[in-house]
Amino acid sequence: MSKLKDPMDDSLKNKLNKEKAIELARVQIEKDFGKGSLIKMGESPVGKYLESIPSGSILLDEAIGIGGYPRGRVVEIFGPESSGKTTLTLQAIAEIQKTGGIAAFIDAEHALDPVYARALGVNINELWLSQPDTGEQALDIAEYLIRSGGVDLIVVDSVAALTPQAEIDGEMGDTQIGLQARLMSKALRKITAILSKSNTCIMFINQIRMKIGLVFGSPETTTGGNALKFYSSLRLEVRKVEQVIGSSSDNVIGNKIRVKVVKNKVAPPFRKAELIVYFGKGISREASILDAAIKYNLVQKSGSWYAMGDDNLGQGRENVIEYLFKEKALANELENKLRKIIFESPSQDSLTVDISKSEENKE
């Protein structure tokens, strides 16, 4: 009686033949295009956890999902005027500088306030600044900085101010359609190819415009065409929610802003974070810590009183925030505990996932 052939033997032989064939292809690819042109995903940085740049608020870090802004990716921050967009980017610059990182600010609007930047914790003596004349110049500078591999964070303020050379050379009444959109599309094609290798995060601040004659759907859109929407791994929408009132009813000391993650390729999208931004001081780290501590039951609230276990922290939210601001050690202890709770046990949600076109899918 003849012995039956084990189908597993054929399967194993087939797999070995395929592996041998792809190894020959890999050798030829590396010969033509250089070492590392084709590798298994687990051997590359793409297959590992993404590094991130802290935002300055643990609530926003949680909403983004990976503990901050992703390195090696494009980030877009957009919203109405005076909603806190530039504040978010300056806070990120301050955070990366604290770890010894290098940041650059491409000020296409020519409106960066060094006094305000310093108040937010930015070391302006170490911040690289460019105030380009044209959009092409701004994006070329960004490309050079990324290729250098020496810059951790680049901020472009703003997309709306990236004026194409042809528009500057033309007359005021000239009609030039799609110049800025084509400029952004070409620049982003070049930039994204080199971003991941340099591990640089580039953040674009963008403004909102209104669509004319729209009957259904939101009339709001962002400037610069659709390229930035597609190439961005993270898109944050910033809105002012309400004013923060001080000791008297007519004393406005800041704003509460809501940051919504409308697109996220590195974690689940559509999360929100509400932050307190004080005038002249920036994002309140202590307010974010307090809100997160209440959320995760590290701090208990009873009426207007706040306690941490058996220890009373104070009465009234603003008083407790002020107390945490003075007691740096306690604030740091709370933040470290929160980061362990939120980020230290990686789940499938915190892995690098490609949720492409998340914003478009929602629509």
UniProtKB/Swiss-Prot annotation:
Gene3D superfamilies: P-loop containing nucleotide triphosphate hydrolases. It is found in: Cytoplasm. ATP binds at G79, P80, E81, S82, S83, G84, K85, T86. GO terms for molecular function: ATP binding; ATP hydrolysis activity; ATP-dependent DNA damage sensor activity; damaged DNA binding; single-stranded DNA binding. InterPro entries: AAA+_ATPase, DNA_recomb/repair_RecA, DNA_recomb/repair_RecA_CS, P-loop_NTPase, RecA-like_C, RecA-like_N, RecA_ATP-bd, RecA_C_sf. GO terms for biological process: DNA recombination; DNA repair; SOS response. CDD domains: RecA (cd00983). It comes from the Bacteria. Keywords: ATP-binding, Cytoplasm, DNA damage, DNA recombination, DNA repair, DNA-binding, Nucleotide-binding, SOS response. GO terms for cellular component: cytoplasm. Pfam families: RecA, RecA_C. HAMAP family: RecA. Can catalyze the hydrolysis of ATP in the presence of single-stranded DNA, the ATP-dependent uptake of single-stranded DNA by duplex DNA, and the ATP-dependent hybridization of homologous single-stranded DNAs. It interacts with LexA causing its activation and leading to its autocatalytic cleavage. Belongs to the RecA family. This is Protein RecA. It comes from Borrelia duttonii (strain Ly).
